[in-house]
């Protein structure tokens, strides 16, 4: 069994992973480019892609072969990004893999970070002039930013990968709702979080 990539994804993966690029079938008379990795070795290839800053969506077959005409139904079952890699086999010894998010309003800059390995998550309000130092201390593998926002000039994101998301994904009320639903609680005071602040 293989995990397969097609079209531009196949071309890029073949180059990055040094795997064979081939073709399967045609689309509008043009051969469809394809590359693949063995199922048993997929995690190693996945880790290599993530370590160089790529995000990977893993799809699995969910339909029965031959149950209907056309391709077998597939669904995304896992998304792995630089900040969400948790397998200890692919992390350096004692390395804590963190994902961080940065947002700002007129008064504060908020940082939220988490380690999916340990389940730890924290937030902090700081100022623009201290943000670069805070991010350097965290050594996050991935930093989430709202579209149109940038990190301070003094911060060199050499070890972190920047992922830009829609601004609405940084709304404090939406963050509070997600967290209270996830933890099954009325509010987040027990976690030291104030719903009125942007660090949620």
Language-model segments: what does each one mean?
Residues 1-198:
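Basic, polar low-complexity surface loops/patches
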């Amino acid at each position: 069994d293989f995990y397969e990539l097609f079209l531009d994804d196949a071309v890029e993966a073949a180059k990055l992973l040094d795997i064979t690029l081939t073709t399967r079938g045609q689309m509008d008379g043009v051969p469809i480019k394809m590359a693949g990795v063995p199922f048993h070795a997929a995690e190693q290839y996945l880790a290599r892609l993530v370590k160089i800053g790529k995000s990977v969506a893993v799809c699995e077959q969910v339909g029965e072969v031959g149950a209907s005409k056309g391709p077998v139904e597939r669904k995304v079952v896992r998304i792995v990004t630089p900040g969400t890699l948790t397998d200890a086999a692919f992390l350096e010894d004692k390395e804590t893999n963190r994902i961080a998010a940065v947002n700002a309003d007129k008064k504060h800059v908020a940082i939220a970070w988490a380690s999916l390995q340990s389940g730890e998550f924290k937030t902090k309000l700081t100022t623009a002039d201290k943000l670069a130092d805070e991010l350097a201390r965290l050594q996050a593998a991935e930093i989430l930013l709202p579209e149109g926002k940038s990190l301070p000039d003094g911060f060199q994101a050499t070890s972190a990968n920047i992922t830009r998301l829609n601004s609405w994904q940084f709304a404090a009320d939406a963050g509070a709702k997600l967290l209270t639903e996830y933890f099954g609680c009325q509010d987040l005071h027990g976690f030291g979080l104030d719903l009125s602040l942007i660090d949620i």
